[in-house]
Amino acid sequence: MLCVVLALSSGSLLAQTTFPLQGTLKKTADRTPVDFANVLLRKPADSTLVVGTTSDEHGGFRLEAPQGTFLLEIHALGYKPFHKTLTLTGALDLGELLLTEEAKELSAVQVTGRRPIMLRKADRMVFDATQIAPAASSILDVLRQTPGVNVSDDGISLIGKGGVIVLINDKRIRLSGAALISLLRSYPQSDLQEIQILTTPPAKYEAEGNAGVLNLILKKAKNDFFGGSISPRFGFRRERAIYSLNTNLNYKKDKVTASLQLGGGWASYDNSLGTYRTYPKQGTFHSSETAFSGKGPHFNVRAGLDYAFTPELSMGVNVSYSPEKDDTRRENDSRDYRILPSGERELLRLLPGVADETDKSQYTTANVHLEKTFKSAPQRRLSWDADYVGYRSQEGRNFTSRGLMPNGTPIPGSDFHFDALTDQHTDSYITSLDYTEPLGKGTLGFGAKGTWTRTTNRSDYDAKSSMGERHDRITFDEHVYALYADLNQPLSDKWSLRTGLRMEYTHTAGENNGRRLEHLKSYINVFPTLFLGFNPNDRHAFSLNGTVRLNRPHFGQLSPFANYENQYSILHGKEDLRAAKRAQLALGYTFLGALNFQLDGGYLWDGITQVIRLDPKTNVGSYTHDNAEKTWTFGLENSFFFNRVSFFQTYISQRLWYSDMKIGPESTSLYGGAGLSYHVSLNNTFFFNRSKTFQGTCYLYYRTPSYDGGFHMGHMITGGAGLSYTLLQGKLRLALDAYNLLRNNLRLDVTTPDYQMNVENGSNPFNCSLGVTYSFGAPIQGKSERKSSQELRSRM
């Protein structure tokens, strides 16, 4: 860590009567909190250190000192030093102390004091978003270039660690998949201040997210200001066009803060998937190659309104709506072969097929929140949230295939057809109450939360389908009640402790086609978190952290009804899926805030994965979601940040790990594997002029073969580059991005005594885009003055 907790100098101080001294540090420009600043109290005569601490994430600090006159000294990276002489005769609250950014003017672009691109804090890794991907157009593009973060059409995850909970300004975004991707694409890169990856999140956060929490901190709106940005974007994915238009509006005047994000666009894509199955005992081989092509619009709107009744009491509302439509055509070529003694294959049958799919989905979310702070104790905080999340999905699918002899002659009775409609309705109601109380030099937080969710899944096949007419319906209720407590306490001038405990009670019930689900169970889980930090000086920092997390099943995975891809591949959910759980312990070391090492170990049990069962006689494959994964993982991570020259900076992250994975229900093991794996990512930024208005980036990610979800995955490489140019005093920004300049198709393998299955996924096509962001706005008071001047001139 760049900064360390500075504490009481000796035992002689402890023998005296002390009084509390507290305050809150904020940025002069926009009154946003300044965290992790060094707050020092010195003797005026010889500048001897009396006591010291650091500000928390809200900018608050608290010291204990004896009676007397002292020099208060505050240092924060990127800010001018703050000095103030004060006399302490009793408890003293300094209120808000404003820090001014240390900046100099370079060619009309303001460059503030250099922040490290990465900073390790007590329970999180913090990346400076302005440096990690300066050529990116949107927040989504920044995340694509953030080390360790994986962005796909299905959502966001941490590489090698699974899914995460996504927050914006500490508020959970209750979207997933394409809806989440669309929302993050609507925010311009310039709105993002930092990216926080909480690998050991406090107990106040849900126990979900087996990799932790991803918190996106946006820049605060200026006071007495109305403005925003508009961002058109156009590009190609392979040879197919993609385009979008996103607009952000922000308003802040006195007690009112409002925001509006509008985004929409059109995307078209193509993809390929090949599945190859070999049955050695039967001497047969089956191939299935599918080409996808799709297109569709997406749209999102998100609005927020906050009102500050007093400086210590505020209330707000956020709503969002994200509809999307996707039309996909699949052309499938399936073939059956006999394996000859020579090893060659003899074609037995062809099964060409065509499928058309239309998927419509929409998310609706609403949040009401109330927050109370206390001037007498800046770290004391009370907050209440109430949320609604609604999800609707409807998918219409049809598939038709014909069986043909190698010479093209139709095979009687081999035709396969279905026409299906599936839909999912999910409604969740959530409320939580959180309270934080100063406790000596630390804080104690506790709270409660309740979640009530109902999901209905329906599956209908018409009478002309080869499997006959079917109509199925399942309703699933889940209630989760949680209590938690968090303690953040410095133990001495070198040791700090953060620990928490979260208890969750989960009640489940449901009906399958009118039949009550008797085997669903209610259960209690306890989730501890621990962080222990040791900072011997300002050059070295050590940490020990441990946590237990869980990953609840997606509600679509609870539907047990057959979902046909074709006659050879059938997908099932499971109505009594349990949450997957992961325990992890990590030991970390940081040198000068730039060189980091972490040694960790973890165990995953009840992991949710698709269990594959193939019938060698019929080649029918069943893919069923089940609590079937058990994995031990041990790893060593390293990262390094270099910015010693003015024209170049780089961030290197790498990980070496060993995993032992078994896939199978209960105590059985159907397949899996064990072995060493390695990945490395490099993120480079080049500055082509002194004012840093013309920048370039290039990034590279490589992973050796590894195991995931029971599959043996082949090596993977991706790389891209970007250019950005800023002009008009930072108001206009042009960005050109190219993704997957280096890429390879992903290969997955499963081997059992009865079969071998290989999958080749061509889901990483080259794509490039040109984005333009124009930012506008002005002080509200200034606008009024200009209007008054115009009226005066008209009278003259």
Residue ranges and their predicted role:
Residues 172-199:
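Short acidic/polar hinge/loop motifs at secondary-structure boundaries
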Residues 26, 38-42, 75-79, 93-133, ...:
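Short, acidic, small-residue-rich periplasmic hinge/interaction motif at the N-terminus
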Residues 627-703:
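Gram-negative outer-membrane beta-barrel transporters
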Residues 424, 476, 550-598, 603, ...:
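Outer-membrane beta-barrel signature, preferentially recognizing the C-terminal barrel domain
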